[in-house]
């Protein structure tokens, strides 16, 4: 086998076996993009959240795997929740009503220092 083929094989194997390390936590824009379909539900809705909202909640749950991601998402959610009036009961039940697990409720009173 020539040197180029060996390097190509090593490169391909490296893609699959070298662990990925995130340099930074999830961005607030990603959090907002995921939860944007939930805003009208959280502010004036009732019953179960719409499917598009739950899709965003599940996407966010999948994206917040590290402690840094969870804290960043918490800070973002808290800052947005402070700027709009959400129904507390809907915010608390959002993740469970969508069959997902988020690190925090969509609430302005959440304590982000305990998240992680």
UniProtKB/Swiss-Prot annotation:
Superkingdom, taxonomy of origin: Eukaryota
Lineage of producing organism: Eukaryota, Viridiplantae, Streptophyta, Embryophyta, Tracheophyta
Record's keyword annotation contains Nucleotide-binding: no
Cited function: Plant non-specific lipid-transfer proteins transfer phospholipids as well as galactolipids across membranes. May play a role in wax or cutin deposition in the cell walls of expanding epidermal cells and certain secretory tissues.
Signal peptide from the UniProt entry: 1-24
Keywords: Disulfide bond, Lipid-binding, Signal, Transport
Protein name as it appears in the record: Non-specific lipid-transfer protein 8
Disulfide pattern: 28-76, 38-53, 54-98, 74-112
Family indicated by similarity: Belongs to the plant LTP family.
